[in-house]
């Protein structure tokens, strides 16, 4: 018994010391949390009773060069529910199903979800939003928002693009200039009680949104409209698969029009054209059909340019001194290269002709001869110098690149076919940009649509054009000689259907058979520019798989002629010329 007393005392001391240690530790922890971590936990406590709401910024508009609005904003509503504020869930569900056209299952799932705020539907028209707001049902929130609206529906749809449900750019310029157009969202911080109900006495903290900037582009809505109407007309008349018309300024690369028919409805971009059985498609098939509908063949697709490429062959040959205008050629209707007979469009041949006449006649044997004179290395280096082997750098996403033989794979047959525009592929925008650079005095241009952006109040204007080096790719003398030859093509040669009364027009026709050969499918095109001695505008018309007559000089040249007849008087810089006035060489 005597032995147990010291043991109990020791036990009590140990327990006492342990209690002191535990209490000291707890005290230290409390001091640490209350003093050193006070700010952190105050912030957490504040977060528990704060609700953050975003304020949408108004998206910048897209306007043509003259200030015509092509993409605008339409005020709409976003309908949401706040779970903790709902007193009559069934009434809320019934109202939202009725007004928004949603299924009960969809609405109930969102209404019964425990969250601070749950979006039910966006892009609701103002009238419907007002009707919902006036019911006064607790827990329903109606916020003003914006959705994209395109006043001209399908005008330049493949250039402008569209936005998604969150108003973010998806395609074309809407996507490329997202950073300029989108602006910055604002913010509202509200104090709430434990149930998430806003405390009106506490007020709110607010950061105003910054609206997006307006984007001005080089398109001229009037020229675009006329080009698009012409493309639709010829597409219908020739029962063609599609028609593209490009109009640009060869001096600086500004695109005045880019039509690629059929265009699509910008305000309803997910609906396929009539005639396509959408209801019978799988999701994958429908997406593929939509992607095809949205594609811009001027930029996204390549093709064999055919005889229009002879402009580039001529420029390279003249610049390298392998041909002169007066050089004589013989055309029996074909030319043999390494045992392969390459035919001319004129089966009986053109007989004796000089280089200018060979270009006017679009004679394949003449251009094969010239190409072989240059040789593969010289021709390839010329194409490289002209910028033909790179992308143009146009400010629209998805530009395709040139598909060309590797330099060491170009033999005599390949060189022969390249010289008249076959066995390789380029984009229409590349052809238009390269020819523009060759006829403008020899300076490479970058085709573009963006001009500048500015705040909606006009207080700040910023150029969006990418600075590019003004690279000389051809001498001014060769450029002038080339323009003179192409003027003769329209005045007295195969391009005479592109002639415009009162103006001097230069140009080149083209007719190319699509791959695989022998299917009877052709691409007809005509490239024209005016005035011939000092070009201010260039147009390229491409008709894919026209039915009936398919020669470029007969079906595409008249389209450019009609285009020029209507837009040349409209362009201030173009001067009228007397019918018999000759082109001036510079």
What do these predicted regions represent?
Residues 1-277, 302, 324, 377-389, ...:
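Periplasmic/cell-envelope proteins involved in peptidoglycan metabolism and beta-lactam response
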């Amino acid at each position: 018994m005597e032995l147990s007393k010291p043991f109990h005392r020791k036990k009590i001391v140990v327990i006492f010391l342990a209690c002191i240690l535990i209490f000291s530790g707890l005290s230290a922890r409390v001091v640490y949390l209350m003093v050193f971590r006070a700010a952190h936990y105050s912030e957490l406590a504040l977060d528990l009773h704060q609700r953050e709401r975003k304020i949408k910024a108004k998206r910048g508009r897209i306007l043509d060069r003259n200030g015509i609005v092509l993409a605008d904003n339409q005020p709409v509503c976003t309908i949401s529910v706040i779970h903790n504020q709902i007193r009559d869930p069934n009434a809320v569900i019934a109202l939202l199903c009725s007004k928004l056209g949603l299924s009960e299952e969809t609405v109930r799932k969102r209404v019964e979800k425990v969250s601070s705020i749950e979006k039910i539907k966006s892009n609701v028209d103002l009238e419907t939003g007002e009707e919902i707001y006036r019911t006064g049902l607790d827990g329903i929130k109606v916020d003003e928002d914006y959705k994209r609206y395109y006043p001209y529906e399908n005008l330049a749809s493949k250039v402008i693009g569209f936005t998604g449900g969150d108003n973010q750019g998806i395609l074309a310029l809407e996507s490329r200039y997202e950073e300029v157009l989108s602006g910055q969202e604002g913010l509202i911080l509200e104090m709430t009680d434990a149930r998430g109900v806003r405390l009106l006495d506490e007020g709110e903290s607010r950061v105003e949104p910054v609206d997006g900037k307006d984007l001005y582009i080089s398109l001229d809505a009037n020229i675009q409209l006329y080009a698009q109407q012409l493309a639709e007309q010829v597409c219908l008349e020739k029962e063609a698969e599609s028609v593209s018309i490009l109009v640009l300024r060869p001096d600086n690369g500004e695109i005045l029009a880019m039509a690629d028919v059929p265009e699509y409805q910008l305000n309803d971009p997910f609906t396929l054209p009539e005639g396509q059985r959408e209801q019978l498609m799988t999701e994958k098939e429908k997406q593929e059909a939509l992607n095809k509908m949205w594609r811009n063949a001027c930029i996204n697709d390549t093709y064999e340019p055919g005889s229009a490429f002879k402009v580039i062959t001529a420029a390279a040959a003249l610049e390298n001194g392998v041909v002169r205008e007066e050089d004589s050629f013989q055309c029996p209707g074909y030319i043999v290269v390494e045992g392969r007979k390459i035919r001319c469009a004129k089966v009986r041949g053109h007989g004796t002709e000089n280089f200018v006449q060979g270009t006017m006649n679009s004679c394949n044997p003449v251009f094969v001869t010239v190409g072989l004179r240059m040789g593969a290395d010289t021709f390839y280096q010329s194409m490289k110098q002209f910028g033909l082997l790179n992308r143009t750098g146009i400010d629209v996403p998805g530009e395709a690149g040139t598909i060309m033989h590797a330099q060491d794979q170009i033999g005599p047959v390949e060189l022969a076919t390249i010289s008249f525009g076959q066995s390789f592929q380029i984009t229409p925008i590349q052809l238009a940009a390269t020819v523009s650079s060759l006829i403008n005095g020899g300076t490479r241009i970058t085709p573009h649509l963006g001009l500048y952006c500015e705040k909606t109040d006009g207080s700040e204007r910023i150029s969006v054009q990418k600075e590019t080096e003004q690279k000389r790719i051809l001498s001014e003398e060769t450029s002038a000689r080339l323009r003179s030859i192409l003027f003769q093509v329209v005045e007295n040669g195969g391009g005479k259907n592109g002639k415009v009364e009162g103006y001097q027009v230069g140009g080149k026709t083209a007719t190319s058979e699509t791959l695989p050969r022998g299917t009877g499918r052709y691409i007809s095109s005509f490239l024209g520019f005016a005035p011939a001695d000092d070009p201010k505008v260039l147009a390229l018309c491409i008709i894919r798989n026209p039915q009936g007559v398919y020669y470029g000089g007969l079906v595409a040249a008249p389209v450019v002629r009609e285009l020029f007849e209507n837009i040349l008087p409209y362009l201030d810089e173009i001067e009228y010329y007397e019918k018999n006035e000759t082109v001036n060489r510079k």
